[in-house]
């Protein structure tokens, strides 16, 4: 008998077995491609905190476009992405008349070099659009330089004005996506359809767990489904992560179904993995003062927290903490909710709670924003703000 293969794919950007809760977005985009140039949903800006499935949605848009005969170029927004788009078009259609200047192969692109590159890029984009259509997807927009974004945006706007068969979708953290559309030279992107990815409902998540496992050859006990749904906290990445490890636990025992016990063990393994992959690397990029801001937020009551209350917890004035707050917003760790009110958004579903309990130690806890996942860990803290993150161990708390 053929061994059932684990259907869950908890790898960043990899397509899951089922795309949950995005049907309307995909239907609107497919119809826009069918309706031709000028359809509003051909321009799309996708925002969301980490773990909400932005890259996966871009992949799905690309799959739809390919099925309709479009050429699709997917790029990340780090330095040199305009040149990478051009290189991809050259590879795909063998545009021998276009040559890439060695001066723009590096990371640093001067304004003169960029103008030359953009001229060739526009020609390549127009040629691809004439043949069968062109979709460009741009991911991690927070990494994009303003200059390159303007160059690509200007070329795209010109093609749209010419009635070319093009589409453009870009994704990133909420503040970075908002920052792009308010740029004076990219105002046309304000008309792009805004898709804000939020947490999935428990109903959607629970149904997906059951359907995915059943199609792959395992049943899911009712109690196990409830545990996995709660642990995922509505985040697509966590759905894949806890589903993957719960399946593995059941598979190793030779079970034909995923029991509550397998779900609990799988959730614990997923939390360990989540800590190593997501939490610890994120905290390494947070300065001591920024972490104190996060810790102060975690000690405040409620979910949406006033900046004044955070500053008070830190023993500082509200104006004094402004720079820490801005960096945390830019990093996607906290989210503005209203005037001077903020919400913790620690990567996918975790926030940091901190409280001292000994002179030389601090107790750390990580919990979901909605309280769905609660784990704790403790670690000695050495001088110099070294939190010993490489040695963190996570345990489930009921």
Q: For the regions a protein language model found, what residue spans apply to each?
A:
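A short, basic N-terminal segment
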Residues: 1-42, 91
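Conserved Walker B catalytic segment
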Residues: 115-175, 182-185
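Conserved small helical "lid"/interfacial subdomain of P-loop NTPases
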Residues: 197-224
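Short, amphipathic alpha-helical interaction segments positioned at domain boundaries
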Residues: 349-366
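Winged-helix-like regulatory helical subdomains adjacent to P-loop NTPase cores
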Residues: 234, 240-316
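Short amphipathic alpha-helical interaction segments
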Residues: 315-330
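Conserved catalytic segments around the Walker B and adjacent sensor/switch elements
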Residues: 63-81
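Walker A/P-loop nucleotide-binding motif
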Residues: 41-59
């Amino acid at each position: 008998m053929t061994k059932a293969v684990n259907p869950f794919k908890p790898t960043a950007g990899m397509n899951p077995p089922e795309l949950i809760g995005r049907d309307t977005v995909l239907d609107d985009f497919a119809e826009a491609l069918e309706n031709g140039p000028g359809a509003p949903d051909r321009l799309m800006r996708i925002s969301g905190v980490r773990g909400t499935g932005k890259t996966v949605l871009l992949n799905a848009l690309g799959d739809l476009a390919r099925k309709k005969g479009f050429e699709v170029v997917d790029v990340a927004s780090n330095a040199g992405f305009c040149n990478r788009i051009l290189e991809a078009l050259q590879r795909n259609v063998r545009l021998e008349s276009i040559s890439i200047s060695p001066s723009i192969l590096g990371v640093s692109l001067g304004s003169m070099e960029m103008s030359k590159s953009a001229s060739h890029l526009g020609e390549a984009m127009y040629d691809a659009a004439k043949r069968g259509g062109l979709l460009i997807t741009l991911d991690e927009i927070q990494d994009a330089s303003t200059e390159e974004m303007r160059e690509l945006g200007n070329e795209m706007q010109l093609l749209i004005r010419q009635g070319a068969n093009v589409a453009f979708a870009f994704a990133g953290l909420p503040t970075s996506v908002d920052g792009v559309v308010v740029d004076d030279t990219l105002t046309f992107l304000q008309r792009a359809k805004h898709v804000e990815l939020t947490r999935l409902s428990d109903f959607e998540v629970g149904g997906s767990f059951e359907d995915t496992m059943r199609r792959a050859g395992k049943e899911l006990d009712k109690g196990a489904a409830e545990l996995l749904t709660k642990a995922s906290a509505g985040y697509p990445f966590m759905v894949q992560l806890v589903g993957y490890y719960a399946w593995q636990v059941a598979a190793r025992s030779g079970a034909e179904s995923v029991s509550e016990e397998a779900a609990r063990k799988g959730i614990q393994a997923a939390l360990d993995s989540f800590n190593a992959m997501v939490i610890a690397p994120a905290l390494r990029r947070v300065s001591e003062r920024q972490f104190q801001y996060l810790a102060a937020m975690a000690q405040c009551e409620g979910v949406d927290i006033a900046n004044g209350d955070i500053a008070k917890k830190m023993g500082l004035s509200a104006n004094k903490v402004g720079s820490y707050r801005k960096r945390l917003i830019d990093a996607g760790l906290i989210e503005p909710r209203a005037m001077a009110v903020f919400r913790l958004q620690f990567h996918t579903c975790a926030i940091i709670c901190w409280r001292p309990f000994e002179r030389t130690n601090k107790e750390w806890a990580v919990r979901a924003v909605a309280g769905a996942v609660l784990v704790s860990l403790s670690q000695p803290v050495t001088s110099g703000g070294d939190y010993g993150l490489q040695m963190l161990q996570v345990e489930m708390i009921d």
